[in-house]
Amino acid sequence: MEDKRQRARVQGGWATPTKSQSATQPASPARSRLSQTAGPAWRSKEQQQCDRQFVFKEPQLVVRAAPEPRVIDREGVYEISLSPTGVSRVCLYPGFVDLKEADWILEQLCKDVPWKQRMGIREDVTYPQPRLTAWYGELPYTYSRITMEPNPHWLPVLWTLKSRIEENTSHTFNSLLCNFYRDEKDSVDWHSDDEPSLGSCPVIASLSFGATRTFEMRKKPPPEENGDYTYVERVKIPLDHGTLLIMEGATQADWQHRVPKEYHSRQPRVNLTFRTVYPDPRGAPR
Protein backbone atom coordinates (compact mmCIF):
# COMPACT_ATOMS: atom_id res chain seq x y z
CA MET A 1 0.00 0.00 0.00
CA GLU A 2 2.82 2.33 0.81
CA ASP A 3 4.48 1.39 -2.46
CA LYS A 4 1.38 2.42 -4.52
CA ARG A 5 1.22 5.89 -2.92
CA GLN A 6 4.90 6.42 -3.58
CA ARG A 7 4.54 5.49 -7.27
CA ALA A 8 1.55 7.90 -7.63
CA ARG A 9 3.59 10.77 -6.24
CA VAL A 10 6.42 10.01 -8.64
CA GLN A 11 4.07 9.86 -11.67
CA GLY A 12 2.33 13.13 -10.64
CA GLY A 13 5.72 14.80 -10.43
CA TRP A 14 6.34 14.03 -14.08
CA ALA A 15 2.86 15.27 -15.15
CA THR A 16 2.76 18.66 -13.37
CA PRO A 17 5.84 20.80 -12.73
CA THR A 18 6.16 22.39 -9.36
CA LYS A 19 5.67 26.16 -8.92
CA SER A 20 9.37 26.69 -8.54
CA GLN A 21 10.10 24.73 -11.71
CA SER A 22 7.47 26.73 -13.68
CA ALA A 23 8.91 30.06 -12.60
CA THR A 24 12.49 29.23 -13.49
CA GLN A 25 11.97 27.29 -16.75
CA PRO A 26 12.43 29.61 -19.82
CA ALA A 27 9.76 29.72 -22.53
CA SER A 28 10.45 27.77 -25.68
CA PRO A 29 12.01 30.04 -28.32
CA ALA A 30 9.97 28.45 -31.10
CA ARG A 31 6.71 29.04 -29.25
CA SER A 32 7.63 32.72 -28.60
CA ARG A 33 8.27 33.38 -32.28
CA LEU A 34 5.11 31.60 -33.30
CA SER A 35 2.94 33.70 -30.98
CA GLN A 36 4.24 36.91 -32.64
CA THR A 37 3.26 35.95 -36.18
CA ALA A 38 0.05 37.34 -37.74
CA GLY A 39 -1.28 33.92 -38.55
CA PRO A 40 -0.42 30.24 -38.72
CA ALA A 41 2.85 29.45 -40.45
CA TRP A 42 1.11 27.00 -42.75
CA ARG A 43 -0.91 29.73 -44.55
CA SER A 44 0.07 30.26 -48.19
CA LYS A 45 1.80 33.43 -49.44
CA GLU A 46 -1.34 34.37 -51.39
CA GLN A 47 -3.47 34.25 -48.25
CA GLN A 48 -0.96 36.36 -46.32
CA GLN A 49 -0.90 38.98 -49.12
CA CYS A 50 -4.71 39.22 -48.92
CA ASP A 51 -4.35 40.47 -45.35
CA ARG A 52 -2.35 43.52 -46.50
CA GLN A 53 -4.14 46.87 -46.54
CA PHE A 54 -3.90 49.06 -49.66
CA VAL A 55 -4.55 52.83 -49.57
CA PHE A 56 -6.26 54.22 -52.70
CA LYS A 57 -4.82 57.48 -53.98
CA GLU A 58 -6.58 59.70 -56.46
CA PRO A 59 -4.61 60.01 -59.72
CA GLN A 60 -3.13 63.45 -60.21
CA LEU A 61 -4.91 65.12 -63.11
CA VAL A 62 -2.95 67.52 -65.32
CA VAL A 63 -5.17 70.60 -65.54
CA ARG A 64 -4.58 72.83 -68.58
CA ALA A 65 -5.63 76.42 -68.29
CA ALA A 66 -5.97 78.85 -71.14
CA PRO A 67 -3.35 81.61 -70.77
CA GLU A 68 -4.49 85.12 -69.95
CA PRO A 69 -4.41 87.45 -72.96
CA ARG A 70 -1.46 89.79 -73.16
CA VAL A 71 -2.57 93.43 -73.34
CA ILE A 72 -0.49 95.84 -75.43
CA ASP A 73 -1.55 99.46 -74.98
CA ARG A 74 1.67 101.47 -74.90
CA GLU A 75 3.89 102.72 -77.68
CA GLY A 76 6.64 100.30 -78.59
CA VAL A 77 7.91 97.40 -80.66
CA TYR A 78 6.81 93.97 -79.39
CA GLU A 79 8.06 90.54 -80.45
CA ILE A 80 5.06 88.38 -79.66
CA SER A 81 6.45 84.98 -80.75
CA LEU A 82 9.41 83.16 -82.26
CA SER A 83 9.02 80.03 -84.39
CA PRO A 84 10.78 78.26 -87.26
CA THR A 85 8.81 80.62 -89.53
CA GLY A 86 10.49 83.63 -87.93
CA VAL A 87 9.80 86.43 -85.46
CA SER A 88 6.25 87.78 -85.18
CA ARG A 89 6.38 91.48 -84.37
CA VAL A 90 3.87 94.29 -83.81
CA CYS A 91 4.65 98.01 -83.47
CA LEU A 92 2.17 100.32 -81.75
CA TYR A 93 2.14 104.12 -82.18
CA PRO A 94 -0.75 105.81 -80.33
CA GLY A 95 -1.34 109.39 -81.44
CA PHE A 96 0.38 108.89 -84.80
CA VAL A 97 -2.19 111.41 -86.05
CA ASP A 98 -3.07 114.14 -83.53
CA LEU A 99 -6.67 114.43 -82.37
CA LYS A 100 -7.64 117.58 -84.23
CA GLU A 101 -6.34 116.30 -87.56
CA ALA A 102 -7.79 112.84 -86.87
CA ASP A 103 -11.25 114.36 -86.39
CA TRP A 104 -11.03 116.09 -89.77
CA ILE A 105 -9.72 112.95 -91.52
CA LEU A 106 -12.54 110.81 -90.10
CA GLU A 107 -15.10 113.25 -91.43
CA GLN A 108 -13.52 113.20 -94.89
CA LEU A 109 -13.28 109.41 -95.03
CA CYS A 110 -16.89 108.82 -93.98
CA LYS A 111 -18.05 111.24 -96.67
CA ASP A 112 -15.73 110.64 -99.66
CA VAL A 113 -14.71 106.95 -99.66
CA PRO A 114 -16.99 104.84 -101.94
CA TRP A 115 -18.09 102.46 -99.19
CA LYS A 116 -19.86 99.25 -100.16
CA GLN A 117 -21.24 96.25 -98.28
CA ARG A 118 -19.99 93.14 -100.03
CA MET A 119 -21.18 89.55 -99.86
CA GLY A 120 -18.90 87.07 -98.12
CA ILE A 121 -18.81 83.32 -98.72
CA ARG A 122 -18.46 80.77 -95.95
CA GLU A 123 -18.93 77.04 -96.57
CA ASP A 124 -20.59 77.87 -99.90
CA VAL A 125 -23.14 80.11 -98.17
CA THR A 126 -23.20 83.81 -99.03
CA TYR A 127 -23.82 86.44 -96.36
CA PRO A 128 -23.54 90.25 -96.13
CA GLN A 129 -20.24 91.26 -94.53
CA PRO A 130 -20.85 93.01 -91.18
CA ARG A 131 -18.95 96.15 -92.26
CA LEU A 132 -18.41 98.36 -95.31
CA THR A 133 -15.23 98.16 -97.39
CA ALA A 134 -13.37 99.96 -100.18
CA TRP A 135 -10.19 99.19 -102.15
CA TYR A 136 -7.43 101.39 -103.55
CA GLY A 137 -4.64 100.06 -105.74
CA GLU A 138 -3.65 99.40 -109.33
CA LEU A 139 -4.05 95.64 -108.88
CA PRO A 140 -7.08 93.57 -107.86
CA TYR A 141 -7.12 91.90 -104.46
CA THR A 142 -8.81 88.61 -103.60
CA TYR A 143 -9.47 87.45 -100.04
CA SER A 144 -12.06 85.06 -98.58
CA ARG A 145 -13.25 84.35 -102.14
CA ILE A 146 -14.04 88.06 -102.64
CA THR A 147 -12.26 89.98 -105.41
CA MET A 148 -11.78 93.74 -105.11
CA GLU A 149 -11.40 95.35 -108.52
CA PRO A 150 -8.48 97.74 -109.22
CA ASN A 151 -9.04 101.34 -108.17
CA PRO A 152 -6.08 103.63 -108.88
CA HIS A 153 -7.98 106.81 -107.96
CA TRP A 154 -6.59 107.54 -104.52
CA LEU A 155 -8.16 110.31 -102.48
CA PRO A 156 -5.56 113.00 -101.67
CA VAL A 157 -5.96 112.44 -97.93
CA LEU A 158 -5.30 108.70 -98.33
CA TRP A 159 -2.20 109.28 -100.45
CA THR A 160 -0.91 111.75 -97.86
CA LEU A 161 -1.39 109.23 -95.04
CA LYS A 162 0.36 106.49 -97.04
CA SER A 163 3.36 108.75 -97.64
CA ARG A 164 3.53 109.74 -93.96
CA ILE A 165 3.55 106.10 -92.83
CA GLU A 166 6.25 105.22 -95.37
CA GLU A 167 8.45 108.08 -94.18
CA ASN A 168 8.13 107.04 -90.52
CA THR A 169 8.43 103.26 -90.89
CA SER A 170 10.78 102.71 -93.87
CA HIS A 171 8.15 100.39 -95.39
CA THR A 172 6.49 101.00 -98.75
CA PHE A 173 2.94 100.16 -99.82
CA ASN A 174 1.00 100.15 -103.07
CA SER A 175 -2.52 99.20 -101.95
CA LEU A 176 -5.11 100.00 -99.31
CA LEU A 177 -8.10 98.09 -97.90
CA CYS A 178 -10.51 100.37 -96.04
CA ASN A 179 -12.97 99.09 -93.42
CA PHE A 180 -15.92 101.05 -92.02
CA TYR A 181 -17.40 99.78 -88.73
CA ARG A 182 -20.70 101.63 -88.46
CA ASP A 183 -21.49 100.63 -84.87
CA GLU A 184 -20.83 97.95 -82.24
CA LYS A 185 -22.52 95.27 -84.38
CA ASP A 186 -19.98 95.54 -87.20
CA SER A 187 -16.95 93.27 -87.00
CA VAL A 188 -14.40 91.15 -88.85
CA ASP A 189 -13.91 87.49 -87.96
CA TRP A 190 -10.68 85.58 -87.30
CA HIS A 191 -8.35 85.57 -90.30
CA SER A 192 -4.78 86.13 -91.46
CA ASP A 193 -3.65 88.43 -94.24
CA ASP A 194 -1.75 85.58 -95.87
CA GLU A 195 -2.96 85.66 -99.48
CA PRO A 196 -0.25 84.54 -101.95
CA SER A 197 -0.28 87.95 -103.65
CA LEU A 198 1.05 89.53 -100.42
CA GLY A 199 4.15 87.34 -100.15
CA SER A 200 5.17 85.11 -97.25
CA CYS A 201 5.93 87.79 -94.63
CA PRO A 202 3.79 90.80 -95.52
CA VAL A 203 3.91 94.10 -93.65
CA ILE A 204 0.46 95.48 -92.80
CA ALA A 205 0.06 99.07 -91.56
CA SER A 206 -3.28 99.63 -89.81
CA LEU A 207 -4.38 103.21 -89.09
CA SER A 208 -7.54 103.77 -87.01
CA PHE A 209 -9.93 106.71 -86.77
CA GLY A 210 -13.06 107.09 -84.66
CA ALA A 211 -14.32 104.90 -81.83
CA THR A 212 -11.87 102.70 -79.94
CA ARG A 213 -12.20 99.03 -80.81
CA THR A 214 -10.24 96.06 -79.47
CA PHE A 215 -7.93 94.35 -81.94
CA GLU A 216 -7.52 90.72 -80.87
CA MET A 217 -4.84 88.24 -81.94
CA ARG A 218 -4.42 84.51 -81.34
CA LYS A 219 -1.50 82.25 -82.19
CA LYS A 220 -2.15 79.40 -84.59
CA PRO A 221 -2.04 76.06 -82.69
CA PRO A 222 0.66 73.42 -83.29
CA PRO A 223 -0.29 70.33 -85.34
CA GLU A 224 -0.83 68.14 -82.27
CA GLU A 225 -3.74 70.36 -81.16
CA ASN A 226 -5.70 69.44 -84.32
CA GLY A 227 -6.93 72.98 -84.91
CA ASP A 228 -7.99 73.59 -81.27
CA TYR A 229 -7.39 77.24 -80.28
CA THR A 230 -8.38 76.77 -76.60
CA TYR A 231 -4.89 76.96 -75.12
CA VAL A 232 -3.08 79.25 -77.57
CA GLU A 233 -1.46 82.58 -76.75
CA ARG A 234 -3.63 85.66 -77.21
CA VAL A 235 -3.02 89.39 -77.48
CA LYS A 236 -5.43 92.32 -77.09
CA ILE A 237 -4.64 95.79 -78.45
CA PRO A 238 -7.06 98.73 -78.00
CA LEU A 239 -6.87 100.87 -81.15
CA ASP A 240 -7.69 104.48 -80.37
CA HIS A 241 -8.45 107.48 -82.60
CA GLY A 242 -5.29 108.24 -84.66
CA THR A 243 -3.38 105.07 -83.63
CA LEU A 244 -1.03 103.26 -86.02
CA LEU A 245 -0.36 99.51 -85.69
CA ILE A 246 2.26 97.70 -87.78
CA MET A 247 2.25 93.90 -88.16
CA GLU A 248 5.42 92.42 -89.65
CA GLY A 249 7.67 89.37 -89.78
CA ALA A 250 5.90 86.01 -89.37
CA THR A 251 2.77 87.56 -87.84
CA GLN A 252 0.45 86.57 -90.70
CA ALA A 253 1.96 83.07 -90.93
CA ASP A 254 1.74 82.31 -87.20
CA TRP A 255 -1.18 84.42 -85.93
CA GLN A 256 -4.80 85.30 -86.68
CA HIS A 257 -6.57 88.56 -85.83
CA ARG A 258 -10.08 89.97 -85.60
CA VAL A 259 -12.20 92.92 -84.47
CA PRO A 260 -15.11 91.40 -82.51
CA LYS A 261 -18.59 92.77 -81.99
CA GLU A 262 -19.07 94.89 -78.87
CA TYR A 263 -21.73 94.58 -76.17
CA HIS A 264 -21.95 98.34 -75.61
CA SER A 265 -22.83 101.10 -78.04
CA ARG A 266 -19.97 102.24 -80.27
CA GLN A 267 -19.63 105.21 -82.59
CA PRO A 268 -18.37 104.75 -86.19
CA ARG A 269 -14.78 103.67 -86.80
CA VAL A 270 -12.69 103.71 -89.99
CA ASN A 271 -9.66 101.45 -90.33
CA LEU A 272 -7.12 101.85 -93.14
CA THR A 273 -4.89 98.82 -93.81
CA PHE A 274 -1.98 99.59 -96.13
CA ARG A 275 -0.19 96.66 -97.81
CA THR A 276 1.84 95.66 -100.87
CA VAL A 277 0.26 93.48 -103.55
CA TYR A 278 2.41 91.72 -106.15
CA PRO A 279 1.14 91.14 -109.70
CA ASP A 280 2.59 87.63 -109.81
CA PRO A 281 2.65 85.62 -106.55
CA ARG A 282 5.71 83.78 -107.86
CA GLY A 283 7.58 87.08 -107.73
CA ALA A 284 6.49 87.96 -104.20
CA PRO A 285 9.25 87.89 -101.55
CA ARG A 286 9.62 84.66 -99.59
UniProtKB/Swiss-Prot annotation:
Which cofactor does this sequence's record say it needs? Fe(2+)
The UniProt entry lists the main location of this chain as nucleus
| Alphabetic keyword roster | Cytoplasm, Dioxygenase, DNA damage, DNA repair, Hydroxylation, Iron, Metal-binding, Nucleus, Oxidation, Oxidoreductase, Ubl conjugation
Specify the Fe2OG dioxygenase domain's residue ranges: 172-278
One GO BP: cell population proliferation
Q: Known PROSITE patterns for this protein?
A: FE2OG_OXY (PS51471)
Gene inactivation phenotype reads: No visible phenotype.
Q: Which domain of life is it from?
A: Eukaryota
EC assignment: the record states 1.14.11.33, 1.14.11.54
Q: Does the keyword Ribonucleoprotein apply?
A: no
Question: Which top class of enzyme applies to this chain?
Answer: oxidoreductase
Instruction: Kindly list the positions annotated as binding 2-oxoglutarate.
Output: 179-181, 269-275
Q: Catalyzes what?
A: an N(1)-methyladenosine in mRNA + 2-oxoglutarate + O2 = an adenosine in mRNA + formaldehyde + succinate + CO2; a methylated nucleobase within DNA + 2-oxoglutarate + O2 = a nucleobase within DNA + formaldehyde + succinate + CO2; an N(1)-methyl-2'-deoxyadenosine in single-stranded DNA + 2-oxoglutarate + O2 = a 2'-deoxyadenosine in single-stranded DNA + formaldehyde + succinate + CO2 + H(+); an N(3)-methyl-2'-deoxycytidine in single-stranded DNA + 2-oxoglutarate + O2 = a 2'-deoxycytidine in single-stranded DNA + formaldehyde + succinate + CO2 + H(+)
Outline the subunit composition.
Interacts with the ASCC complex composed of ASCC1, ASCC2 and ASCC3. Interacts directly with ASCC3, and is thereby recruited to the ASCC complex. Interacts with OTUD4; the interaction is direct. Interacts with USP7 and USP9X.
User: What is the role of this chain?
Assistant: Dioxygenase that mediates demethylation of DNA and RNA containing 1-methyladenosine (m1A). Repairs alkylated DNA containing 1-methyladenosine (m1A) and 3-methylcytosine (m3C) by oxidative demethylation. Has a strong preference for single-stranded DNA. Able to process alkylated m3C within double-stranded regions via its interaction with ASCC3, which promotes DNA unwinding to generate single-stranded substrate needed for ALKBH3. Can repair exocyclic 3,N4-ethenocytosine adducs in single-stranded DNA. Also acts on RNA.
The protein, known as: Alpha-ketoglutarate-dependent dioxygenase alkB homolog 3
Write down the species: Mus musculus
